[in-house]
Every structure is written in C-alpha cells, then in structure tokens.
C-alpha cells in the first residue's frame, strides 16, 4: 500500500473537501491486514552512513540488521506461544463493524483481507462502487517497539471514488482523502525481556486489551479525519502541546495541535502531518504556538 500510494507522489495528508463529502451516501470499507503475527521493530543501523557510505558500510549495516532481527525473534519466541490464538485481522473485522455502525456515513460493506493491494486491484474495487459510494481503505501495520515497551500501530487510510470520476483533489489516480494514523500504547516495564514478561502475563491479558484499544483508537482517528466540519490543521496561533514518543531506541518529542483529549489518551496532529493517538502521561509540556 505504501508503494502504491507513494507511486502517486501524494502528500502525507489530503483533507476531505466538503464538495466531495456531500456526494458520498455510503462507504465500502476495505481493511488490509497482511501480517499474521506481531513483530518487533528493529532499529536500522547507521554504521554505513557514519563511515561515508559505500559497499562495505552497507554490508556492515546488513549484518547488524540481520543480527538484531535474530535476537528479536529469539526474545519473542516464548511470547508467541502465549499469543498464538491472537488474530488481529479478526479483531479488526469485528471492531470496525461495531465502531462504524453509528457513523454519520452509512457503511454498506466491510471486507477484511490479508491480500495486499496493487493498482489493478484498487482500480477493480473502485469500478465496482455503485453511485454515491466511496471506497475507504485502511492498511494497518502493528509491532512492538525495539525495546518491547510499546505496542504501535501505523495505518494508512485513504478514500477513493470510481476511477471514471475524477476528484477535485487532483485527478482519477488520487484519493479524495488520505491520512497516516499512528497509535502508541502506554509504555510497559523497563524494556527487554522484562517488558515481554509483563505483556505475556495472565495469558497476555494486557497485550490483548491493548491490541483491541489500538483498533478502537485507529477507527476513532479515521472518523475524525472524515469529518469535514472538524478537519484538524496545524495553524499558527493554535495551542501546541509536546508529547514523548518512544521510537524503540530513545524517547523523542512530538509537537503539534491537540485535536481531541480524554482522561487517558490524546489525539495529536503533529508537525509531520500524521495523526497520533498517544497516552496522556506522555504529555510533557504545553506551549503556545509561535506568534
């Protein structure tokens, strides 16, 4: 999906225009979950870049990356046994039907599949749409951070009309809406095997509940993005808030406009134009945007 969208040279974020929204009477939701199991994100080595690049540097990086993957898989071995029956695809399929049942646009059909998309499949799906219906694509990828402390889900979401109906957003090969949604769980433990032990305790109760929460939050962000009346935008003068974000190696900072905030989680439109659902405890500072 990333390659498919990247080939179109599209911006990270395309807001749904009111004109396009007014034409939509129903959605055909198509969820692509290619993965069969959770993986751990592996930090990319940077020896090659530090040494000036070249073949030798690339070979060193490849060797380090392979070693990290093996170490990660070995650490996850016993954890996989506990979550063997976890089916993210099934969980998403059940959740999307209930979560979107009361959405303001009727969801006519829901398809959840492991089959990856290409342009031919996308065109076929679009051409099957009846009048007034739009195709909502959701393509989630889920993982544990490299230190095993967080469960992350990054989803590419886009909405398409029939291929013979050019959109006002830029033509027939461009979606009428696009966004990248990122969920990060509360941090668990101090990292490594100790964090995996917590995730796996009590038949992986915490992991299972966090997985379901990630799906609910992803759908919540998707619905916010499709509501043209509340389309978030990072404008100067809006209140900016700073949040901690674990990338698996270090804790970095994300800064942006708070779109929605609750007791436990906040949805943030960050400067990279991704929409994030982050735990409230990761909020570290609030500052006014530059005047």
What would you call each of these model-derived segments?
Residues 9-99, 231-291:
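A structural "domain/chain start" motif
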Residues 14-25, 115, 122-123, 142-144:
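N-terminal, polar/charged subdomain of small-to-medium soluble alpha/beta proteins
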Residues 21-25, 127-132, 159-177:
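A short, structured loop/turn motif at beta-sheet edges
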Residues 71-82, 164-225:
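Short secondary-structure boundary motifs at beta->alpha junctions and helix caps
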Residues 102-119:
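Short beta-strand->alpha-helix linker/helix-N-cap micro-motif
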Residues 119-146:
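A short, hydrophobic beta-strand-centered structural micro-motif
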Residues 153-158:
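Aromatic/basic-lined ligand-recognition segments
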């Amino acid at each position: 999906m990333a390659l498919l969208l990247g080939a179109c040279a599209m911006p990270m974020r395309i807001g749904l225009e009111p004109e396009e929204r007014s034409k939509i009477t129903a959605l055909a939701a198509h969820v692509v979950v290619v993965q069969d199991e959770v993986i751990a994100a592996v930090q990319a080595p940077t020896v090659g870049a530090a040494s000036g690049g070249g073949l030798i540097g690339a070979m060193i990086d490849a060797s380090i990356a392979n070693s990290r993957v093996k170490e990660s898989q070995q650490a996850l071995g016993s954890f996989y046994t506990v979550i063997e029956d976890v089916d993210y695809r099934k969980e998403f399929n059940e959740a999307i039907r209930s979560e979107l049942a009361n959405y303001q646009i009727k969801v006519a059909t829901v398809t959840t599949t492991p089959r990856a998309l290409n342009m031919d499949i996308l065109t076929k799906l679009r051409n099957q749409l009846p009048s007034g219906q739009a195709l909502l694509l959701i393509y989630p990828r889920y993982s544990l951070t490299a230190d095993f402390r967080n469960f992350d889900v990054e989803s590419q979401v886009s909405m398409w009309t029939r291929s013979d109906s050019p959109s006002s957003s830029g033509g027939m090969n461009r979606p009428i809406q696009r966004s990248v949604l990122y969920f990060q769980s509360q941090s668990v433990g101090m990292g490594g095997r100790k964090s995996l032990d917590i995730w796996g305790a009590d038949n992986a109760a915490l992991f299972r509940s966090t997985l379901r929460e990630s799906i609910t939050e992803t759908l919540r962000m998707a619905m916010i993005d499709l509501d043209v009346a509340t389309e978030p935008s990072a404008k100067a003068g809006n209140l900016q808030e700073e949040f901690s974000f674990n990338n698996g190696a270090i804790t970095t900072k994300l800064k942006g406009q708070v779109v929605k905030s609750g007791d436990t989680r906040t949805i943030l439109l960050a400067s990279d134009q991704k929409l994030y659902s982050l735990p409230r405890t990761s909020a570290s500072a609030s500052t006014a945007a530059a005047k």
